[in-house]
């Protein structure tokens, strides 16, 4: 096959490429090069058409499975999930052990909402690679990670824990596997959280913990700061900043210009963080600040909190589909003065965006109470409860203090106070309460609860329900300590 040289303008180039593909004169490398170029220019439809045409006339080519793979990925990006599934199946018909296609076929099933089919797809691949090469082992572990992730999201915690442990036994250096495994153990109150085997050491397990998980595991502030630093270094790494000149702080006071403040979060919706922030966004003094919201979460429909937030800010940006670099470019082009990270190290965080330093001032606020341990978060907004003055040495950020760090929406509907009977509580008992998630309950805390309840006859502990099996596990431990589970 021939390579493509200069073949004219952009529109004529596309038509010439189609003709070359039809006559089997378009080299495989050129298919990828031009399709990727079209995609980067926002011409994804033309990229899809180029792949489709080439495949129609070159299906016998020894590299056809790779073109089917790229074609499928592009269709998935355009939300043509059935087409993506068919293309990925075609790739696997040519090469049944094509690891990336095995993984992405499961992802396409997941996108279609067929979670059992996604899990079965990955399981079949895992079973077919029990005797395999080092390269295929990597894809086998990846498939196991996806199974664990989907099961975790579906609340199948014990099943997810089992498959992730098997993945760790195969590749203990894959920290993302251990990160999910330890978090799942916490949600089930399985103590001790950390275990080891002949293949996985205790040190590897601890090193795989995310800062969020570690915050529920250890109260050692130096340990938490060190883990945040290491996590940031490995997760964000050394980004290419050559096209991101360092932003300088602009003096705007007295110039008539408004300060541009940007909030980046996946939780600007019906979510605990969204509930906290919505009135705060409404209360900004719009004569002195211009508010930009950068939403990096999944699309939501008919979301009352997001609707209210969109009305409160000056500019709303959906950046969920953008790469970290593209999102950082968007923020930089908006000339944001102060960029606020509302996620920290919580779920769906886009920490790499901040690594590009798209604003001169970057602040950690509201979503994550720990230190980011990063070189690009300069400040953290906190109060005396979140960061006592004596604890500031354990934060890489300069701590800026306000009276209360927890925004409250005063317009939020408050239900009528229920009676004890309606809440399922005894009329005359003293009620201790804990409405934290299960992952925040430690073995030490549980021992203290047992001591308190035993020393306080007639009292009860009112808890937030978690996973059904975790509830049963805690109740069984209370009963074993002589405390009535009812």
Model region roles, listed by residue range:
Residues 275, 446-447, 472, 476:
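Feature representing long, continuous alpha-helical segments
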Residues 270, 324, 441-442, 467-471:
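Alpha-helix N-cap/loop-to-helix initiation residues
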Residues 260-262, 433, 462:
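Short, well-ordered beta-strand segments
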Residues 1-426, 437, 479-482:
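Alpha-helical solenoid repeat scaffolds of the TPR/TPR-like class and their adjacent stem/linker regions
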Residues 280-287, 443-457:
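Short hydrophobic signal-anchor/transmembrane segments that target glycosyltransferases
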């Amino acid at each position: 096959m021939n390579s493509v040289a200069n073949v004219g303008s952009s529109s004529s180039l596309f038509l010439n490429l189609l003709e070359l593909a039809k006559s089997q004169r378009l080299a495989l490398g050129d298919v990828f090069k031009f399709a990727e170029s079209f995609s980067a220019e926002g011409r994804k439809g033309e990229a899809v058409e180029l792949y489709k045409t080439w495949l129609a006339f070159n299906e016998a080519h020894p590299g056809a499975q790779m073109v089917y793979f790229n074609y499928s990925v592009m269709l998935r990006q355009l939300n043509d999930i059935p087409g993506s599934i068919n293309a990925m199946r075609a790739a696997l018909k040519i090469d049944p052990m094509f690891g990336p296609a095995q993984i992405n076929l499961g992802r396409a099933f997941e996108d279609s909402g067929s979670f059992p089919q996604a899990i079965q797809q990955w399981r079949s691949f895992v079973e077919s690679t029990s005797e395999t090469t080092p390269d295929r082992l990597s894809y086998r572990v990846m498939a196991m990670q996806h199974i664990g992730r989907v099961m975790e999201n579906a609340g199948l915690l014990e099943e997810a824990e089992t498959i992730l442990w098997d993945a760790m036994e195969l590749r203990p250096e894959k920290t993302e596997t251990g990160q999910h495994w330890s978090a799942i153990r916490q949600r089930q109150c399985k103590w001790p959280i950390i275990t080891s085997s002949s293949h996985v050491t205790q040190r590897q397990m601890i090193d795989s913990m995310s800062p969020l998980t570690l915050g529920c595991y250890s109260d050692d502030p130096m340990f938490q700061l060190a883990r945040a630093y290491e996590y940031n270094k490995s997760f964000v790494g050394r980004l290419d900043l050559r096209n991101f000149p360092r932003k300088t702080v602009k003096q705007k006071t007295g110039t008539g210009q408004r300060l541009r403040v940007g909030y980046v979060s996946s939780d600007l919706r019906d979510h605990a963080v969204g509930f906290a922030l919505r009135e705060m966004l409404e209360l900004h003094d719009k004569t002195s600040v211009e508010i930009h919201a950068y939403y990096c979460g999944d699309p939501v429909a008919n979301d009352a909190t997001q609707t209210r937030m969109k009305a409160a800010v000056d500019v709303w940006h959906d950046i969920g589909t953008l790469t970290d670099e593209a999102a950082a470019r968007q923020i930089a082009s908006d000339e944001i003065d102060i960029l606020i990270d509302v996620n920290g190290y919580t779920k769906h965080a886009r920490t790499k965006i901040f690594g590009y330093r798209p604003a001169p001032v970057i602040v950690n606020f509201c979503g994550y109470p720990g230190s980011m341990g990063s070189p690009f978060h300069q400040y953290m907004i906190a109060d005396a409860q979140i960061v006592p003055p004596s604890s500031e040495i354990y934060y890489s950020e300069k701590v800026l203090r306000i009276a209360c760090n927890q925004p409250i929406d005063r317009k939020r509907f408050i239900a009528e106070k229920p009676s004890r009977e309606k809440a399922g509580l005894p009329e005359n008992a003293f009620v201790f309460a804990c409405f934290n998630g299960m992952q925040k309950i430690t073995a030490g805390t549980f021992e203290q609860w047992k001591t308190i309840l035993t020393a306080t006859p007639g009292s009860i502990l009112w808890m937030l329900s978690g996973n059904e099996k975790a509830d049963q596990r805690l109740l069984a431990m209370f009963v074993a300590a002589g405390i009535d589970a009812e």
